[in-house]
């Protein structure tokens, strides 16, 4: 909120501050605007209310001032009057209809403001006009919260008397008692508790009033709560007690009081930290730690991650507290879950005084910690030279490796402090030592661009061409120094893009400096690693322009070819990673810009695929070909740019093409860039290709056009653009399907309608695919009701044409009852009797799929329940043979299907159910059979149902057949009886004479 100079304000505002009603009247009479706004949208009435001048307020309102005007914080004059505790001003404003429920931007009403500012008289005027005193602001706080927070005893009394909810909570579930306790308003705390406030209440994170008071050092409130008998060791959601909180905030007086009242000094929280851990770490916890130790706190207790209080002092460098812990029995070499002692932790964080204390007290400097590293490893890795000096003086085998074979010198080289390097070298560290990957300290220094470390190592004799297990030298690592990783690390601390870019430039220069020094000391830039890459490849891959320039000056290595086992050239690597500056350096030294990688892709292809516009521009400007196809998919850079929707790259490629036909170039599958753009839904790319007159009716190897693909993938805007270019909608693919078929199959009713209008206006409109299926077949098969409705609006679809497996069959076979109902309602109901080329009716289809609702629909439309197909089977037989018990139940019990019908092999429904082992279906049929002749009916193999049931081991069916009079002596064509012994496999049973 700005502070304005009174002398610069309008005369009316100055007169209000002067308190001169006569001058105000004169100014108003001179048409001074009574509703004029200042820079913060405050009116003269806001000023008068702020001053609490009732007479002037009255005068302004009678002169037309808006009583409920809001400033830019949404504060009304009533808010201002209440804040000034002016009862008279409040009464005048309310008399003139001031809104007592008005809210500011924090949703605070005048009552909130009154409560916060101890405006008791104002509150007494406002409250009778309110429906509730428990209205909450944006933070969920009521007027009682504000009164308690500010310690206004009289206001709290008034609000409680007027019905304020004493246990109302804000959005963090904090009560008025929490706020009063935190602020140390003992009289308010006592008053709230006396009126029934819940003394053990918790907020969302489990903090009680005791936690709140302890955190802010409110000793009197803490004593009062303890005297009331609250649970002293109550925990919050993190497992912290009031003692934890007091120690964390360095409230030693509260700590002393809690200990005197019996608080558990060794209570662990959810992470296993005790109050002593917090006291050891906190900024102001020294006295707290003394109190805890003197009252029996366990100095060696460990958290869940193994940290002792001594570890905590080591993290934060609290060396005085570390001495206290050690003097009271703290274990110096206690290890955490990573194996680190306090000395490791202190070394990592660079606390020299603490290291001195620990070593003096007997800490083991040669103890192995995380990854078997010494404290010296960690000090060197984090570039703490003074700590290294302290640790070196204790004496141990300096070249002892960690788990990964790294010595302290490796760590120092990675850390980048040359003083650490010199200290270790002067102590006899061997710079020839290799880690388990074969890397020397020089490799580490180069990888991190630590120039002075590289210089120190090379000067003392380090081999600049020493290779690691992957065949990489220090030059490889310097060339590959990851700027983006450094940028990311810097970004954790800074969020300024300019600053990050400057930092990147500094690192780039460091890398170039390191590289130049290595080259000056006979580093060989031609050495290739085991993947065939040399330092030029790495510099290109990581975009180090300066490094590339240096390397290209120093080497005659032919890097145009992907030789030496390398899969990609430097040009490919720079293009793929979008390093246009590095690319430009390479282009100056290259003759062939169209060299290929192992898959036949050029650098231009990779740049276009990744969408690196500047790289694409650099390549095409230098003459890179856009016609070169890869070896696998036969795609060009045009295809590559389209796949990921890189329209800028696509435009560059098209505008530099000499041959306009390039826009329709095809890949191995016959796909043009337009087809791919449509398939992937890249609208801008589609628009650009159409602008460049791409052929909308080009077909791929399966006959699909871009329109086919657009409808298949459902990209609406792409389809619309193709239709606007009059793309053929009757073009058939290799299966004879048009875009209409795909629209119907995919459920695109809107497109289908639009396509139909165009298709039906053309002559020779054939809408059958190679199998005779129409769009109606496909819509029905996939259950697309909206599409069916669109198609049935056209007269030509109200009769079934094409494949005799009709649209009704298609709907029924997949259980689309609503689609079938649409067809039956729009077309002659006699279509239920339509047969496919195998003579099967729609009822057969419903029975086959066990679709009960479809069966019932067809039966309601007089479907012939006993109609047989070409093999003599009824719908019941179809259901029985396929084990569709639901369909069998409906056909047998509701439709009363004929159980005596036989197929061409003389099988009854019962034979078929039993032959396939469908016990439930067989029992449903048996339940309706009373005729023994049907029970003993024989098929063409002279088998009765009993023969088949016995052979298939259907025990329950056999029992039911026998109960219904099945003949056990019946003989089939192999002379087998249903109850006789089975013949051995491969032998014939001799016929009885």
Curated annotation (Swiss-Prot):
Oligomer and partners: Protein phosphatase 6 (PP6) holoenzyme is proposed to be a heterotrimeric complex formed by the catalytic subunit, a SAPS domain-containing subunit (PP6R) and an ankyrin repeat-domain containing regulatory subunit (ARS). Interacts with PPP6R1.
Presence of the UniProt keyword Magnesium in the record: no
Record protein name field: Serine/threonine-protein phosphatase 6 regulatory ankyrin repeat subunit B
Region (Disordered) residue spans: 974-993
Alphabetically ordered keywords of this record: ANK repeat, Repeat
Ranges of the ANK repeats in the UniProt entry: 7-36, 40-69, 73-102, 106-135, 139-168, 172-201, 205-234, 238-267, 271-301, 305-334, 338-367, 371-400, 404-433, 437-466, 470-498, 531-561, 566-595, 599-628, 633-662, 669-698, 702-731, 735-764, 771-800, 803-832, 838-867, 871-901, 905-934, 941-970
InterPro entries for this protein: Ankyrin_rpt (IPR002110), Ankyrin_rpt-contain_sf (IPR036770)
Highest taxon in the source lineage: Eukaryota
PANTHER family to which the protein is assigned, alphabetical: ANKYRIN REPEAT DOMAIN 52-RELATED (PTHR24178:SF21), MOLTING PROTEIN MLT-4 (PTHR24178)
Role noted for this protein: Putative regulatory subunit of protein phosphatase 6 (PP6) that may be involved in the recognition of phosphoprotein substrates.
SUPFAM superfamilies: Ankyrin repeat (SSF48403)
């Amino acid at each position: 909120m700005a502070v304005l100079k009174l002398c610069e304000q309008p005369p009316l505002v100055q007169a209000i501050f002067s308190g001169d009603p006569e001058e105000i009247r004169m100014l108003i009479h001179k048409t001074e605007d009574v509703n004029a706004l200042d820079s913060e949208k405050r009116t003269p009435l806001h000023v008068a209310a702020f001053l609490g001048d009732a007479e002037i307020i009255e005068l302004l309102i009678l002169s037309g001032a808006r009583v409920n005007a809001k400033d830019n914080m949404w504060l009304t004059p009533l808010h201002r009057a209440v804040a000034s505790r002016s009862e008279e001003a409040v009464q005048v404003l309310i008399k003139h209809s001031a809104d007592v429920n008005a809210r500011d931007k924090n949703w605070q009403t005048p009552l909130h403001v009154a409560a916060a500012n101890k405006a008791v008289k104002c509150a007494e005027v406002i409250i009778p006009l309110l429906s509730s005193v428990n209205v909450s602001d944006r933070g969920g706080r009521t007027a009682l919260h504000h009164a308690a927070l500010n310690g206004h005893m009289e206001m709290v009394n008034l609000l409680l008397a007027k019905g304020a909810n004493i246990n109302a909570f804000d959005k963090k579930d904090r009560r008025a008692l929490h706020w009063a306790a935190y602020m140390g308003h003992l009289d308010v705390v006592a008053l709230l508790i006396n009126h029934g406030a819940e003394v053990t209440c918790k907020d969302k994170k489990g903090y009680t009033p005791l936690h709140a008071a302890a955190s802010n050092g409110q000793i009197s409130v803490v004593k009062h709560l303890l005297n009331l008998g609250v649970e002293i060791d109550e925990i919050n959601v993190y497992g912290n007690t009031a003692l934890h909180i007091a120690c964390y905030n360095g409230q030693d007086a509260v700590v002393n009081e809690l200990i005197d009242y019996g608080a558990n000094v060794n209570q662990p929280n959810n992470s296993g930290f005790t109050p002593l851990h917090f006291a050891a770490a906190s900024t102001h916890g020294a006295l707290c730690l003394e109190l805890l130790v003197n009252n029996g706190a366990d100095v060696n207790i460990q958290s869940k991650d193994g940290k002792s209080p001594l570890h905590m002092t080591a993290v934060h460098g609290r060396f005085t507290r570390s001495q206290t812990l050690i003097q009271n029995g703290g274990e110096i070499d206690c290890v955490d879950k990573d194996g680190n002692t306090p000395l490791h932790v202190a070394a990592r964080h660079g606390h020299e005084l603490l290291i001195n204390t620990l070593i003096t007290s007997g800490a083991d400097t040669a103890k192995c910690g995380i990854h078997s590293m010494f404290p010296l490893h960690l000090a060197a890795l984090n570039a703490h030279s003074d700590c290294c000096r302290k640790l070196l003086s204790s004496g141990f085998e300096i070249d002892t490796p960690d788990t990964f074979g790294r010595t302290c010198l490796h760590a120092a080289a990675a850390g980048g402090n040359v003083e650490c390097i010199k200290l270790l070298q002067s102590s006899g560290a061997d710079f020839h030592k290799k880690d388990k990957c074969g890397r020397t300290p020089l490799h580490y220094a180069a990888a991190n661009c630590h120039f002075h470390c590289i210089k120190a190592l090379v000067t003392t004799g380090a081999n600049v061409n020493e290779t690691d297990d992957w065949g990489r030298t220090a030059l490889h690592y310097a060339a590959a120094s990851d700027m983006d990783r450094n940028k990311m690390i810097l970004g954790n601390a800074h969020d300024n893009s300019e600053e990050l870019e400057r930092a990147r430039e500094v690192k780039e220069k460091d890398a170039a400096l390191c590289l130049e020094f290595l080259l000056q000391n006979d580093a060989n830039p031609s050495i290739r690693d085991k993947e065939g890459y040399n330092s030029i490849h790495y510099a290109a891959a990581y975009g180090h322009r300066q490094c590339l320039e240096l390397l290209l000056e120093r080497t005659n290595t032919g890097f145009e070819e992907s030789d030496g086992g390398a899969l990609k050239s430097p040009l490919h690597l720079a293009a793929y990673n979008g390093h246009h500056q590095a690319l430009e350096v390479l282009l100056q030294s290259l003759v062939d810009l169209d060299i290929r990688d192992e898959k036949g892709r050029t650098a231009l292809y990779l740049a276009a695929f990744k969408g690196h516009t500047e790289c694409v521009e650099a390549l095409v400007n230098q003459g890179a070909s856009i016609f070169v196809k890869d070896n696998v998919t036969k795609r060009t850079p045009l295809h590559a740019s389209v796949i990921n929707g890189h329209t800028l790259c696509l435009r560059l490629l098209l505008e530099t093409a000499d041959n306009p036909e390039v826009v329709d170039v095809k890949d191995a599958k016959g796909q043009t860039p337009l087809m791919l753009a449509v398939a992937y839904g890249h609208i801008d790319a589609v628009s650009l290709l159409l602008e460049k007159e791409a052929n909308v009716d080009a077909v791929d190897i399966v006959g699909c056009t871009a329109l086919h693909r657009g409808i298949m993938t459902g990209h609406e805007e792409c389809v619309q653009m193709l239709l606007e270019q009059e793309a053929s909608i009757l073009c058939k693919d290799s299966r004879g399907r048009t875009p209409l078929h795909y629209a119907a199959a995919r459920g695109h009713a809107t497109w289908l309608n639009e396509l139909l209008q165009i298709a039906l206006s053309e002559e020779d409109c054939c809408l059958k695919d190679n199998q005779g299926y129409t769009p109606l077949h496909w819509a029905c098969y996939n259950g697309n009701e909206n599409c069916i409705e669109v198609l049935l609006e056209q007269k030509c679809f109200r009769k079934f044409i094409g494949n005799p497996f009709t649209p009704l069959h298609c709907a029924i076979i997949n259980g689309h009852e609503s689609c079938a109902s649409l067809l039956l309602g729009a077309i002659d109901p006699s279509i239920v009797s339509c047969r496919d080329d195998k003579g099967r009716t729609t009822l057969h289809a419903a029975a086959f799929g066990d679709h009960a609702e479809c069966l019932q629909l067809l039966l309601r439309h007089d479907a012939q329940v006993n109609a047989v197909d070409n093999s003599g089977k009824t719908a019941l037989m179809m259901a029985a043979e396929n084990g569709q018990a639901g369909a069998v139940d409906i056909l047998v019990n509701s439709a009363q299907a004929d159980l005596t019908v036989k197929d061409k092999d003389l099988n009854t429904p019962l034979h078929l159910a039993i032959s396939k082992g469908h016990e439930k279906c067989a029992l449903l049929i048996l339940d309706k059979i009373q005729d023994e002749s049907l029970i003993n009916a024989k098929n063409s193999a002279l088998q009765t149902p009993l023969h088949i049931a016995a052979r298939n081991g259907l025990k329950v069916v056999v029992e039911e057949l026998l109960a219904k009079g099945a003949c056990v002596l019946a003989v089939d064509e192999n002379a087998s009886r249903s109850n006789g012994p089975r013949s051995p496999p491969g032998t014939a049973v001799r016929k009885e004479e």
